[in-house]
């Protein structure tokens, strides 16, 4: 499989497809970070997502890869803001310009493989991104050869579809994991089918998908937090994502050399170690009372995106700082719930969503 017009190395044995070996760099121990990145490259990892939790990452990446820049692919996000030293989200044009200049300097590069329209989840986000000039800036960077390909990231299939309609996008970053997709029989409803339709469109149009949150923020690796009531392994989660149409690379978070070694082990894993068919033996009762983000409760009379609010909350409580920031940028938050009961009556998994909105509003403070 080829991302845009560039070749990409690294086959996943047994998947029937070629895929970039990719990672998403997470915060971790300061010592050895650059060395760990060099080690990753030496072992065939050549695709890096740079929507990271902290600003220091860019310096480490620049030191690790400046001498082998042509051998690695960078996803750089036009809308990720690190002016405070930590991740922030913005559609402000001047902030985006400052951030891209700063990131290019720290990365010690004069070009970006994939310039991403960053994390737009609501229609108003996309409208602002165009109105504020951020999209035109990204297009100008591509016209001038600084950006090689345009990508986009979103958690919302409907909006992703709309952005793909522009014909501008070569790559899409999307969350793919069993927790988000789990549906059975009469429960095969809502966003799961929308997501599959989106993946198939990407496959048909030659748009590569890079996968974020393959472990659902760690939820799937722990029996206590997994919606299935039992843990999956990282290799099962990676294979699950790779088997979806259009997927080019899966981007698990890494912190150190040990994480890289664990990830590289996937390439030598047996079919049995990758097999995730256990999911099919689980029945809908296994997830009753847990939101699986199917959005069967939509449309909400008060305008809330109930599934997305739940998703951000579930990720935030297990330590995903980016999810908390995304929540605070939602137009309608849990505190806007009017407890009308519409979602409670429509939820096929019997989640008490009105009560849950109160819990989420209390957690985030809004």
Tell me what each language-model feature is:
Residues 1-78, 82, 143:
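N-terminal binding-site loop/beta-alpha segment at the start of enzyme catalytic domains
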Residues 3-6, 36-41, 45-46, 63, ...:
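Structured C-terminal cap/extension of enzyme domains
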Residues 11-17, 24, 48-50, 72-76, ...:
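Hydrophobic faces of well-ordered beta-strands that scaffold small-molecule active sites
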Residues 17-31, 78-97, 123-127, 222-231:
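Active-site mouth loops of central-metabolism enzymes
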Residues 19, 52-56, 78-82, 116-121, ...:
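Active-site-proximal loop/turn and secondary-structure-junction residues that shape catalytic pockets
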Residues 28-31, 42, 88-210:
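Glycine/proline-rich, positively charged
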Residues 66-68, 91-93, 167-170, 190-191, ...:
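Short, hinge-like loop/turn segments at secondary-structure boundaries
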Residues 71-75, 168-177, 270-277:
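Short hydrophobic/aromatic-enriched beta-strand-loop microsegments
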């Amino acid at each position: 499989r080829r991302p845009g017009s560039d070749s990409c190395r690294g086959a996943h044995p047994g998947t029937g497809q070629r895929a970039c070996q990719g990672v998403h760099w997470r915060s971790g121990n300061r010592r050895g970070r650059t060395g760990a990145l060099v080690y990753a490259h030496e072992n065939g990892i050549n695709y890096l997502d740079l929507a990271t939790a902290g600003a220091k990452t860019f310096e480490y990446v620049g030191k690790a890869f400046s001498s082998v820049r042509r051998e690695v692919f960078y996803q750089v996000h036009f809308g990720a803001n690190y002016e405070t030293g930590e991740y922030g989200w913005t559609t402000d044009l001047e902030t985006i310009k400052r951030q891209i200049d700063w990131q290019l300097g720290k990365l010690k590069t004069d070009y970006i493989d994939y310039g991403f329209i960053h994390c737009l989840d609501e229609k108003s986000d996309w409208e602002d991104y165009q109105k504020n000039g951020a999209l035109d800036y990204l297009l100008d960077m591509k016209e001038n050869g600084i950006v090689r390909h345009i990508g986009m990231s979103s958690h919302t299939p409907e909006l992703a579809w709309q952005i793909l309609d522009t014909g501008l996008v070569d790559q899409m970053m999307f969350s793919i994991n069993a927790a988000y997709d789990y549906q059975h029989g009469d429960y095969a409803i809502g966003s799961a089918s929308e997501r599959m339709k989106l993946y198939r469109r990407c496959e048909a149009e030659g748009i590569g998908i890079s996968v974020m949150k393959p472990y659902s923020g760690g939820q799937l690796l722990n029996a206590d937090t997994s919606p299935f009531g039992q843990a999956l392994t990282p290799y099962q989660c990676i294979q699950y994502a790779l088997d979806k149409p259009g997927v080019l690379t899966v981007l698990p978070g890494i912190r150190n050399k040990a994480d890289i070694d664990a990830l590289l082990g996937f390439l030598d894993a047996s079919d049995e170690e990758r097999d995730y068919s256990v999911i099919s033996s689980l029945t809908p009762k296994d997830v009753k009372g847990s939101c699986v983000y199917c959005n069967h409760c939509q449309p909400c009379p008060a305008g809330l995106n109930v599934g997305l609010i739940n998703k951000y909350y579930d990720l935030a409580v297990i330590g995903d700082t980016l999810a908390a920031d995304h929540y605070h940028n939602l137009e309608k938050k849990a505190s806007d719930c009017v407890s009308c009961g519409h979602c409670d009556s429509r939820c096929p998994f019997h989640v008490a969503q009105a009560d849950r909105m109160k819990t989420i509003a209390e957690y985030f403070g809004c």
